């Protein structure tokens, strides 16, 4: 096993077959937090052995996504380092060397089977009621490979350039044990493992061989990856042993699955599409189909909120604290506090995190975001009043775009009114008070500020013998079109005397039929 005195080295090793799923970002984040906590290094390796599934732009997307959530790569693709190259397609020659070593020592073999022969084998096993037909320790002895063919025939085929793959020779009747950092001891019998292909006919390695060779050569001490790789872990343990690297084998930690919001099954792109929430960190456009998906960033999620949300998808600090800076996450993070069972993907929790972080933004940032939203809608405004509006609305924000959704009435007079509020709060008494208030404001000649317009309102209410609570929603309705919102007196100060009077007059005319109905 890995030497506990060595510097911790972890890697994130995605395949450039499309955009990086948010679950992949979580895996990268856990690797990063662990490396930083242990004073170690974080590597990025691109596992592009499957050239048929390679997608242009995917590698750049991966690097941009990791940078956006605050992950700093110490070594690897895009950075360089002593173990370059960090793309598996550029390391192709070295994998053959290790595959041939496995053959020479009796732990792998050449397999010359055609696709037709492989299909015939599967059909034969299905007919014999074998539940999961596979190329394994039993069926390999009935196939065309270097275990069944004479040595001179194998040599002839190799010399002739016949197509072949190299398969792992899984031992018979053996228990393979793995002590996972999250799940504890995992014990698998070798009879359940098939003879996986290690080197494909095009000379490219499969994931199983390439990741073992690269992890060893890059001195990886801990492999933190998704639960979907747990069934392959015993196979990887065998490879470490067969290659003579058992003593330096990294420690494994297999992360719990990200589940659908209802908890029934693994989270997928289809679930995100159906639920109307993002599943990729950044916008993505498929270069083949032209289909597009919006990312967390472009939907308005802040980097800090997204990172915090992802950290809690399977891990918890064991305290009541929920908001963490990256440095605080690093300090608190331990693999031992990662759960074994799958975690529901709760987009409402992601929104909650964004709300908290929006409220913590500096005043100048909030003002800038408000200005950007107002400019998008070509609104007219007094720039000097924007900081106050930004502060008044910040408690109502989930995303920056909510500045317009929640505060459009600061910039534009309402043309429609909340029907529910109008039907319950707009009555003869409200009309009398609002009419009187409109006239009182028109006659008022003092400084027009929140405190003074409130004083004028109280004078009107006292004369009419009406409690403020009875007409406040109706007054807000007249001024903003809604029944709830920020401080109304401050609002009146911001829009100004002339605009406030004009809005009340419009409401009195437009809603007058409510009184008579």
Curated annotation (Swiss-Prot):
Q: Which UniProt keywords apply?
A: Aminoacyl-tRNA synthetase, ATP-binding, Cytoplasm, Ligase, Nucleotide-binding, Protein biosynthesis
Give the top-level enzyme category. Answer: ligase
* Compartments where located: Cytoplasm
Where along the sequence does the record place the motif called 'KMSKS' region? 266-270
Binding site residues for ATP = 269
Q: What residue ranges carry the coiled-coil annotation?
A: none
Gene3D superfamilies, per database record: 1.10.10.350, HUPs (3.40.50.620)
- Where does this chain carry the motif 'HIGH' region? 14-24
Cystine residue pairs: none
The catalytic activity, as recorded, is: tRNA(Glu) + L-glutamate + ATP = L-glutamyl-tRNA(Glu) + AMP + diphosphate
Q: Which domain of life is it from?
A: Bacteria
Cellular compartments per GO CC: cytosol
Question: HAMAP family, from UniProt?
Answer: Glu_tRNA_synth_type1
Which NCBIfam families is this protein grouped with? gltX_bact
Q: What does this protein do?
A: Catalyzes the attachment of glutamate to tRNA(Glu) in a two-step reaction: glutamate is first activated by ATP to form Glu-AMP and then transferred to the acceptor end of tRNA(Glu).
Q: What is this protein called?
A: Glutamate--tRNA ligase
Q: Which gene encodes it?
A: gltX
